[in-house]
Protein backbone atom coordinates (compact mmCIF):
# COMPACT_ATOMS: atom_id res chain seq x y z
CA UNK A 1 0.00 0.00 0.00
CA UNK A 2 1.27 3.47 -0.91
CA UNK A 3 2.05 5.73 2.04
CA UNK A 4 -0.59 8.54 2.04
CA UNK A 5 2.02 11.01 3.25
CA UNK A 6 4.20 10.13 0.26
CA UNK A 7 1.20 10.75 -2.00
CA UNK A 8 0.67 14.15 -0.38
CA UNK A 9 4.36 15.01 -0.66
CA UNK A 10 4.40 13.98 -4.33
CA UNK A 11 1.26 16.00 -5.08
CA UNK A 12 2.60 19.16 -3.45
CA UNK A 13 6.06 18.85 -5.00
CA UNK A 14 4.74 18.16 -8.50
CA UNK A 15 2.25 21.02 -8.19
CA UNK A 16 5.10 23.41 -7.40
CA UNK A 17 7.18 22.05 -10.30
CA UNK A 18 4.18 22.42 -12.63
CA UNK A 19 3.78 26.09 -11.74
CA UNK A 20 7.50 26.75 -12.28
CA UNK A 21 7.46 24.90 -15.62
CA UNK A 22 4.41 26.88 -16.74
CA UNK A 23 5.86 30.24 -15.65
CA UNK A 24 9.22 29.60 -17.33
CA UNK A 25 7.66 28.02 -20.46
CA UNK A 26 10.11 25.11 -20.25
CA UNK A 27 7.28 22.83 -21.47
CA UNK A 28 4.02 23.45 -23.27
CA UNK A 29 0.69 22.33 -21.75
CA UNK A 30 0.79 18.80 -23.17
CA UNK A 31 4.47 18.42 -22.31
CA UNK A 32 3.80 19.61 -18.77
CA UNK A 33 0.95 17.12 -18.34
CA UNK A 34 3.07 14.18 -19.51
CA UNK A 35 5.98 15.36 -17.35
CA UNK A 36 3.75 15.49 -14.25
CA UNK A 37 2.48 11.97 -14.98
CA UNK A 38 6.05 10.72 -15.44
CA UNK A 39 7.10 12.53 -12.27
CA UNK A 40 4.28 10.92 -10.30
CA UNK A 41 5.30 7.45 -11.49
CA UNK A 42 8.94 8.09 -10.59
CA UNK A 43 8.07 9.65 -7.21
CA UNK A 44 5.97 6.64 -6.18
CA UNK A 45 8.51 4.06 -7.38
CA UNK A 46 12.09 5.34 -7.28
CA UNK A 47 11.37 8.12 -4.79
CA UNK A 48 12.18 11.79 -4.43
CA UNK A 49 15.78 11.30 -5.59
CA UNK A 50 14.55 10.17 -9.00
CA UNK A 51 12.26 13.16 -9.35
CA UNK A 52 15.02 15.55 -8.30
CA UNK A 53 17.27 14.03 -10.98
CA UNK A 54 14.55 14.66 -13.59
CA UNK A 55 14.02 18.20 -12.30
CA UNK A 56 17.77 18.91 -12.47
CA UNK A 57 17.78 17.67 -16.07
CA UNK A 58 14.79 19.83 -17.02
CA UNK A 59 15.96 22.97 -15.20
CA UNK A 60 19.59 22.97 -16.34
CA UNK A 61 18.68 22.00 -19.92
CA UNK A 62 16.04 24.73 -20.13
CA UNK A 63 18.53 27.30 -18.84
CA UNK A 64 21.21 26.34 -21.36
CA UNK A 65 18.65 26.27 -24.17
CA UNK A 66 18.09 29.98 -23.59
CA UNK A 67 21.79 30.88 -23.38
CA UNK A 68 22.82 32.28 -26.75
CA UNK A 69 19.36 31.54 -28.14
CA UNK A 70 19.44 34.32 -30.74
CA UNK A 71 22.76 33.07 -32.10
CA UNK A 72 21.41 29.51 -32.22
CA UNK A 73 18.33 30.75 -34.05
CA UNK A 74 20.44 32.72 -36.53
CA UNK A 75 22.13 29.51 -37.69
CA UNK A 76 18.85 27.60 -37.74
CA UNK A 77 19.75 25.34 -34.82
CA UNK A 78 17.60 26.69 -31.98
CA UNK A 79 14.78 24.75 -30.35
CA UNK A 80 11.42 25.71 -31.80
CA UNK A 81 8.89 27.81 -29.85
CA UNK A 82 11.59 29.66 -27.94
CA UNK A 83 12.92 26.46 -26.42
CA UNK A 84 9.55 25.28 -25.09
CA UNK A 85 9.41 21.50 -25.37
CA UNK A 86 6.36 19.30 -25.98
CA UNK A 87 5.02 15.91 -24.90
CA UNK A 88 6.88 13.97 -27.58
CA UNK A 89 10.16 15.38 -26.31
CA UNK A 90 9.22 14.40 -22.75
CA UNK A 91 8.42 10.83 -23.82
CA UNK A 92 11.50 10.54 -26.03
CA UNK A 93 13.75 11.63 -23.18
CA UNK A 94 11.88 10.16 -20.22
CA UNK A 95 10.00 7.11 -21.45
CA UNK A 96 12.83 4.64 -20.87
CA UNK A 97 13.44 6.07 -17.40
CA UNK A 98 9.74 5.65 -16.62
CA UNK A 99 9.83 1.98 -17.62
CA UNK A 100 12.97 1.43 -15.52
CA UNK A 101 11.24 3.07 -12.54
CA UNK A 102 8.23 0.76 -12.84
CA UNK A 103 10.50 -2.29 -13.16
CA UNK A 104 12.38 -1.11 -10.07
CA UNK A 105 9.12 -1.26 -8.12
CA UNK A 106 8.07 -4.65 -9.52
CA UNK A 107 11.34 -6.63 -9.56
CA UNK A 108 12.38 -7.10 -5.94
CA UNK A 109 15.32 -9.37 -6.80
CA UNK A 110 16.93 -6.97 -9.31
CA UNK A 111 15.90 -3.62 -7.89
CA UNK A 112 19.32 -1.99 -7.98
CA UNK A 113 19.85 -3.08 -11.58
CA UNK A 114 16.78 -1.09 -12.62
CA UNK A 115 17.73 1.80 -10.35
CA UNK A 116 21.05 2.09 -12.15
CA UNK A 117 19.25 1.76 -15.48
CA UNK A 118 17.01 4.66 -14.45
CA UNK A 119 19.97 6.84 -13.48
CA UNK A 120 21.89 5.92 -16.64
CA UNK A 121 18.94 6.71 -18.87
CA UNK A 122 18.39 10.17 -17.37
CA UNK A 123 22.13 10.89 -17.32
CA UNK A 124 22.39 9.99 -21.02
CA UNK A 125 19.56 12.23 -22.25
CA UNK A 126 20.74 15.01 -19.94
CA UNK A 127 24.23 14.70 -21.44
CA UNK A 128 22.88 14.65 -24.98
CA UNK A 129 20.80 17.78 -24.43
CA UNK A 130 23.75 19.58 -22.85
CA UNK A 131 26.03 18.44 -25.67
CA UNK A 132 23.67 20.10 -28.12
CA UNK A 133 23.00 23.32 -26.22
CA UNK A 134 26.60 23.88 -25.07
CA UNK A 135 28.05 22.68 -28.37
CA UNK A 136 25.99 25.24 -30.30
CA UNK A 137 27.92 27.96 -28.45
CA UNK A 138 31.19 26.71 -29.95
CA UNK A 139 33.05 28.90 -32.44
CA UNK A 140 34.87 25.88 -33.85
CA UNK A 141 33.78 23.84 -36.85
CA UNK A 142 31.19 21.13 -36.30
CA UNK A 143 32.27 17.64 -37.38
CA UNK A 144 30.17 14.59 -38.20
CA UNK A 145 30.58 11.76 -35.70
CA UNK A 146 31.19 9.30 -38.58
CA UNK A 147 33.82 10.36 -41.12
CA UNK A 148 34.52 13.68 -39.37
CA UNK A 149 33.36 15.69 -42.37
CA UNK A 150 32.24 19.25 -41.77
CA UNK A 151 28.63 19.66 -40.65
CA UNK A 152 26.39 22.65 -40.15
CA UNK A 153 25.55 23.72 -36.55
CA UNK A 154 22.69 21.65 -35.19
CA UNK A 155 22.90 19.01 -37.92
CA UNK A 156 22.02 15.50 -36.67
CA UNK A 157 25.27 13.63 -36.09
CA UNK A 158 27.35 16.76 -35.63
CA UNK A 159 29.73 16.99 -32.65
CA UNK A 160 32.11 19.54 -31.13
CA UNK A 161 34.72 19.41 -28.38
CA UNK A 162 32.70 21.98 -26.43
CA UNK A 163 29.67 19.72 -26.74
CA UNK A 164 31.54 16.99 -24.87
CA UNK A 165 32.29 19.52 -22.14
CA UNK A 166 28.51 19.77 -21.85
CA UNK A 167 28.37 15.97 -21.56
CA UNK A 168 30.82 16.08 -18.66
CA UNK A 169 28.83 18.86 -16.96
CA UNK A 170 25.64 16.80 -17.19
CA UNK A 171 27.40 13.70 -15.88
CA UNK A 172 28.73 15.53 -12.83
CA UNK A 173 25.32 17.04 -12.04
CA UNK A 174 23.67 13.62 -12.43
CA UNK A 175 26.30 12.09 -10.16
CA UNK A 176 25.91 14.73 -7.44
CA UNK A 177 22.09 14.61 -7.40
CA UNK A 178 22.02 10.80 -7.38
CA UNK A 179 24.63 10.51 -4.64
CA UNK A 180 23.02 13.13 -2.40
CA UNK A 181 19.31 12.48 -2.77
CA UNK A 182 18.67 8.80 -3.46
CA UNK A 183 17.60 7.06 -0.27
CA UNK A 184 19.02 3.71 -1.39
CA UNK A 185 22.76 3.53 -0.64
CA UNK A 186 24.76 3.86 -3.86
CA UNK A 187 28.43 2.94 -4.19
CA UNK A 188 30.18 6.26 -5.01
CA UNK A 189 32.78 4.74 -7.35
CA UNK A 190 30.34 2.50 -9.21
CA UNK A 191 27.91 5.41 -9.52
CA UNK A 192 30.64 7.69 -10.92
CA UNK A 193 31.66 5.10 -13.52
CA UNK A 194 27.99 4.58 -14.37
CA UNK A 195 27.12 8.20 -15.05
CA UNK A 196 30.36 8.90 -16.93
CA UNK A 197 29.96 5.91 -19.24
CA UNK A 198 26.18 6.23 -19.65
CA UNK A 199 26.48 9.96 -20.40
CA UNK A 200 29.36 9.67 -22.86
CA UNK A 201 28.23 6.52 -24.67
CA UNK A 202 24.58 7.59 -24.67
CA UNK A 203 25.32 11.02 -26.16
CA UNK A 204 27.65 9.45 -28.73
CA UNK A 205 25.01 6.87 -29.67
CA UNK A 206 22.60 9.75 -30.17
CA UNK A 207 25.01 11.38 -32.62
CA UNK A 208 25.55 8.11 -34.50
CA UNK A 209 21.80 7.48 -34.75
CA UNK A 210 21.30 11.09 -35.77
CA UNK A 211 23.73 10.80 -38.67
CA UNK A 212 22.70 7.33 -39.85
CA UNK A 213 18.98 7.10 -39.09
CA UNK A 214 17.39 10.48 -38.40
CA UNK A 215 15.36 11.80 -41.30
CA UNK A 216 16.74 14.95 -42.92
CA UNK A 217 14.73 16.76 -45.58
CA UNK A 218 15.20 19.52 -48.13
CA UNK A 219 12.48 22.12 -48.55
CA UNK A 220 10.98 22.20 -52.05
CA UNK A 221 10.36 25.95 -51.76
CA UNK A 222 13.38 27.55 -50.08
CA UNK A 223 15.90 24.72 -50.50
CA UNK A 224 16.83 24.66 -46.82
CA UNK A 225 17.85 21.45 -45.06
CA UNK A 226 15.37 20.71 -42.29
CA UNK A 227 14.25 17.99 -39.90
CA UNK A 228 10.63 18.90 -40.65
CA UNK A 229 8.68 16.73 -43.13
CA UNK A 230 6.77 19.86 -44.15
CA UNK A 231 8.43 23.24 -44.72
CA UNK A 232 7.16 26.49 -46.23
CA UNK A 233 3.73 24.90 -46.47
CA UNK A 234 4.89 22.06 -48.74
CA UNK A 235 6.04 18.44 -48.18
CA UNK A 236 9.83 18.26 -47.93
CA UNK A 237 12.06 15.84 -49.88
CA UNK A 238 13.86 13.15 -47.85
CA UNK A 239 17.61 13.40 -48.49
CA UNK A 240 18.99 11.24 -45.66
CA UNK A 241 17.95 8.79 -43.00
CA UNK A 242 14.75 6.84 -42.37
CA UNK A 243 11.46 8.63 -43.01
CA UNK A 244 9.67 9.26 -39.73
CA UNK A 245 12.74 8.55 -37.60
CA UNK A 246 12.77 11.97 -35.97
CA UNK A 247 14.66 13.62 -33.14
CA UNK A 248 12.45 12.04 -30.50
CA UNK A 249 13.26 8.56 -31.82
CA UNK A 250 16.95 9.45 -31.64
CA UNK A 251 16.43 10.64 -28.06
CA UNK A 252 14.88 7.27 -27.23
CA UNK A 253 17.96 5.52 -28.66
CA UNK A 254 20.13 7.68 -26.41
CA UNK A 255 17.98 6.94 -23.35
CA UNK A 256 17.95 3.19 -24.00
CA UNK A 257 21.71 3.15 -24.56
CA UNK A 258 22.30 4.93 -21.26
CA UNK A 259 20.05 2.47 -19.44
CA UNK A 260 21.77 -0.57 -20.95
CA UNK A 261 25.26 0.79 -20.23
CA UNK A 262 24.32 1.57 -16.62
CA UNK A 263 22.77 -1.86 -16.10
CA UNK A 264 25.92 -3.48 -17.51
CA UNK A 265 28.14 -1.46 -15.18
CA UNK A 266 26.03 -2.52 -12.20
CA UNK A 267 26.05 -6.17 -13.26
CA UNK A 268 29.73 -6.54 -14.10
CA UNK A 269 31.67 -3.95 -12.09
Question: What are the functions of these language-model segments?
Answer:
Residues 1-269:
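Hydrophobic alpha-helical transmembrane segments
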Amino acid sequence: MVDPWLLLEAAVFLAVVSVVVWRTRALDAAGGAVAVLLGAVVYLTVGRGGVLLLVAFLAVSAAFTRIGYERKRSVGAAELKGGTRGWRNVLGNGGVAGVAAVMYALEASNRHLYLYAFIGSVAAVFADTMATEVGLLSRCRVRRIIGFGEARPGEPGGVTALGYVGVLMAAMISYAVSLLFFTNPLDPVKLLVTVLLASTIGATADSVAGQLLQSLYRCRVCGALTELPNHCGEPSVLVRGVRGFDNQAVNAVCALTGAVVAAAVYAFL
